[in-house]
């Protein structure tokens, strides 16, 4: 299939620059796979779509305030360092650096008046560098103090409250971007979901910057995804499998939860097992879902791998029709935007 098959017109003013004050006040478009009829609701309506005996699966990753602004010790030049991945058991990180040409192996960068320093230990592709960090105390506490949220490139407004780019259940540190479908949930709404007899399960996938990487090939079959770390506990796997056995539907919150479940389910004939690892699964039309029945997701970029994923669950024609209606009705798009509920097939 061609990348162009997933293109649509999107006026720039529909890209949400700031989050709404009330997380559940976002609009919700309800989509039935194979149909061009949609329902326009508000997000709290998701409670009506979930049924007793279903299972809601959420990604509990926590976004790191991974953008650090520092100065080159030697010259005082300003350097931006974006943390991507910690090398296991070390104080070394893979990073993206701007401007990369000013940073060579051995370069020392200082952050926060010396609260944190970093020495470049290696050069990677595309402006990447490895750094070893030096500090007194706990690294992640210093990062919370000095770091900024790595907002997507299409958001140009400064985020006043870091917590608005975290889900209310964010727990496991490690993401370079938020699992944005989960931003709509409040603790109160999750309690109402549980009270209805819906199982609420948490899994983890650390979202990488590859989530914003454009598809640069003409044929989608030739696109390669960046690998991202995932983890599913035995308790989570057991609950999901029990719900499926009992005829309940598995509703994934976000494309990250979807990709995690399908990574595992596609290996074990639809069974979810406790495991952790790295996934580069790319879901596009032609793929058969093994675990996920329904999906809560935001509105995504034209020609993105995320539009391809939702088109696989709901059909391409249904999604492109829904997106056209979303533009006409002035829905808010992307990370801080509105949501879509793709109903399970009956």
UniProtKB/Swiss-Prot annotation:
Kindly list the places in or outside the cell where this protein is found, as annotated in its UniProt entry: Cytoplasm
What Pfam families does the database record attribute to this sequence? Queuosine_synth
Recorded catalytic activity of this chain's protein: 7-aminomethyl-7-carbaguanosine(34) in tRNA + S-adenosyl-L-methionine = epoxyqueuosine(34) in tRNA + adenine + L-methionine + 2 H(+)
Pathway field of the UniProt record reads: tRNA modification; tRNA-queuosine biosynthesis
Keywords associated with the record: Cytoplasm, Queuosine biosynthesis, S-adenosyl-L-methionine, Transferase
Q: Does the keyword S-adenosyl-L-methionine apply?
A: yes
Its EC top class is: transferase
Q: What is its main location?
A: cytoplasm
One cellular component term from this protein's GO annotations in UniProt: cytoplasm
Q: What is its EC number?
A: 2.4.99.17
Any one GO MF term held by the record is: S-adenosylmethionine:tRNA ribosyltransferase-isomerase activity
Q: Does the keyword Transferase apply?
A: yes
GO biological process terms, alphabetically, are:
queuosine biosynthetic process; tRNA wobble guanine modification
Which intervals of the chain form a coiled coil?
none
* Family statement drawn from the similarity comment of this UniProt entry: Belongs to the QueA family.
Subunit details: Monomer.
- What role is this protein assigned? Transfers and isomerizes the ribose moiety from AdoMet to the 7-aminomethyl group of 7-deazaguanine (preQ1-tRNA) to give epoxyqueuosine (oQ-tRNA).
Query: What's this protein's name?
Result: S-adenosylmethionine:tRNA ribosyltransferase-isomerase
Annotated organism of origin: Lysinibacillus sphaericus (strain C3-41)
Provide the gene name from the record: queA
């Amino acid at each position: 299939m061609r990348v162009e098959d997933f293109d649509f017109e999107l006026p720039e003013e529909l890209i949400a620059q700031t989050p709404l004050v009330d997380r559940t006040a976002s609009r919700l478009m309800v989509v039935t796979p194979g149909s061009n009829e949609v329902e326009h609701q508000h997000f709290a309506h998701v409670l009506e779509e979930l049924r007793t005996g279903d299972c809601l699966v959420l990604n509990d990753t926590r976004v790191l305030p991974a953008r650090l602004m520092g100065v080159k010790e030697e010259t005082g030049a300003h350097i931006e360092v974006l943390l991507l991945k910690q090398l296991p058991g070390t104080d070394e990180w893979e990073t993206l650096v701007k401007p990369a040409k000013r940073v060579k192996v051995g370069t020392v960068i200082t952050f926060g008046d010396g609260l944190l320093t970093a020495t470049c230990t290696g050069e990677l592709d595309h402006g990447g560098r490895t750094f070893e960090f030096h500090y007194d105390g706990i690294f992640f506490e210093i990062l919370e103090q000095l770091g900024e949220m790595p907002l997507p490139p299409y958001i140009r407004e400064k985020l006043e409250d870091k917590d608005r780019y975290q889900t209310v259940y964010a727990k496991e540190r490690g993401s370079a971007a938020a699992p944005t479908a989960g931003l709509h949930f409040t603790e109160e709404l999750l309690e109402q979901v549980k009270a209805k007899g819906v199982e609420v399960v948490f899994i983890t996938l650390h979202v990488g910057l590859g989530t914003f990487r454009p598809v640069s090939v003409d044929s989608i079959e030739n696109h390669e995804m960046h690998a991202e770390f995932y983890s599913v506990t035995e308790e989570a796997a057991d609950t999901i499998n029990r719900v499926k056995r009992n005829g309940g539907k598995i509703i994934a919150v976000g494309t990250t939860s979807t990709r995690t479940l399908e990574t595992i389910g596609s290996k074990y004939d639809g069974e979810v097992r406790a495991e952790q690892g790295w996934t580069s699964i790319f879901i596009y039309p032609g793929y058969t879902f093994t675990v996920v029945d329904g999906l809560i997701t935001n509105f995504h970029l034209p020609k993105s791998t995320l539009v391809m994923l939702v088109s696989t669950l709901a059909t391409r024609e249904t999604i492109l029709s829904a997106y056209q209606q979303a533009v006409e009705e002035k829905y808010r798009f992307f990370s801080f935007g509105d949501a879509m509920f793709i109903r399970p097939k009956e």
